[in-house]
């Protein structure tokens, strides 16, 4: 008590009281100003380090495809990058400029060819590395559970308890006919729960050189921000990265029959569905407007159509994405490889990339041609420049 009385000496009190009053008045004023119009000030998602990742992997799978999920967990999900190559960003990443109308000037055929050539040379060069810190990747296997029998549900729940990487979609019946709905619900759940920079949508029969994909994305992200700091940007640049097709005929029959596509007599440009990458802003747009978007049969065509009007999307056509309905000729520079079995995935992980070609039936038709995309031409003429 004596010590307390000492510090509350008369002269000290005279100095403290005005300061205390000023502090309380300042707090009151701050609260009044902050609550003037709370509706117009969205709070946003509270940062949660456990749910914050650089790259999300949305792997579309069926309940019964446990063998494929196991192969993925045992192969490419282990290819987490530990270092980043300094030369990658300088030699292999191209950030396109905006024109005076605010449209992105996409890569010419010549630029695409040069970037591929640079990459093939880069693969053979000794690498100069720096440490890569805080690089987080979150894989999620999306499975529709609506209408599933109890034994299937029990198996999925057990798998989730063991691995913790299942995105359970209770409201989605898992079938090809519902694939677009499945993608929409997946993006809504991911956008609501996670903070991330990019999302890769993948089929469960697609092998990914995840270390290369992640390194490319991080280099792209860093270079994009460097360019935007140096130049007066005309707004944020979003990324839509994959192997684009621009002259596809609208399907009138079969599993891919499209009854509701009336925008044109051909599909607009879209990245093939074996695997593509979207930046966070595009995922959020799709998730936010999911209830208003047209539910086209093929999800890759749907995504391309939903994103068609936007001027600030970098549509990055990349021949390293072998993501069509049938594999192209095997190349060491391919980064995403579609239509691979669990055995093929283990072969690739062991360094044998092309064993799938031994399993191709004879007389089954030729391999699709690999092309650069000419963005200066109409979509019907886009894809005639072969690699």
Where are these regions (language model features)?
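Secretory-pathway lumenal glyco-enzymes, predominantly type II signal-anchor Golgi glycosyltransferases
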Residues: 1-387
